[in-house]
Amino acid sequence: MQSVTILPGRDKTGTPEPFQGITLERGELCTIVGNTGSGKSRFIKDVEQLAHGDSVTRRRVLLDGVEIPAERRQSLSSQLVAHLGQNMRFVLDASVEEFLALHAQCRGKETPPVEVLALANEITPEPVALGQSLNQLSGGQSRALMIADIALLCDSPIVLIDEIENAGIDKERALGLLQRHDKLVLVVTHDPHTALMSRRRIVMGGGAVAAVVERSPQEAALYMELGELYRRQQTYQASLRRGDHLA
């Protein structure tokens, strides 16, 4: 799979969506913005389910320009799509090392657990240990581990993420990591800095795609400014967590 195309459906009132369709490629980051209740979660749910005009929005999702038969959608969705929600917790009673080794074995990969863990620890301020129980991981640690797992072990080319800025991880490194591993990443966000990371953003309103916006040169410059503020905030957070006074 190299591309996903989302074709328009209808908004909450039944009015046709005012866009012509959008095609997203592997290695691309696309952000999704809009007020609470505007339809952001429904949009990524349509992508996750490879909707075929049978969801409440009546959108259709194509893979490489081809419609997916109904009998294949569930199996393809589980193979192609990884979804990182806001609240992640493991239910498996195992250590981090056991989980990563088991997942690598299931995927037919030879990537050692220590390599995945090293990647996870690049994006979380609270390091994860191989011997640590999955049930003891914080939400941020769990997300960092799963992002590294998706990048190195998981073959799913589509990654859906809800509000990565609330995960307590380095979002710039995390999203860059997924893109470098040729994932198509869709991120639901309320944060201007995150929204401007992508070349294109989808604006939701009233349950519909209200617009697909290309990032302007002015917004690209603003993104760099917001990035400086983001990194300064990270420095302040690290100082506060060490018990330091802010100067």
Q: How should these model regions be labeled?
A:
Residues 1-26, 55, 71-72:
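A short, flexible loop at the N-terminus of ABC-type nucleotide-binding domains that lies
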Residues 139-159:
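GG-anchored amphipathic helix commonly corresponding to the ABC/SMC/Rad50 NBD signature/C-loop
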Residues 187-190:
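H-loop/switch region of ABC-family ATPase nucleotide-binding domains
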Residues 196-204:
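Conserved catalytic segment of ABC-fold P-loop ATPases
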Residues 119-136:
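Conserved ABC nucleotide-binding domain
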Residues 34-40:
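Walker A (P-loop) phosphate-binding loop of P-loop NTPases
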Residues 207-239:
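Conserved beta-strand-loop-alpha-helix hinge in the C-terminal portion
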Residues 28, 42-106:
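ABC ATPase nucleotide-binding domain signature region
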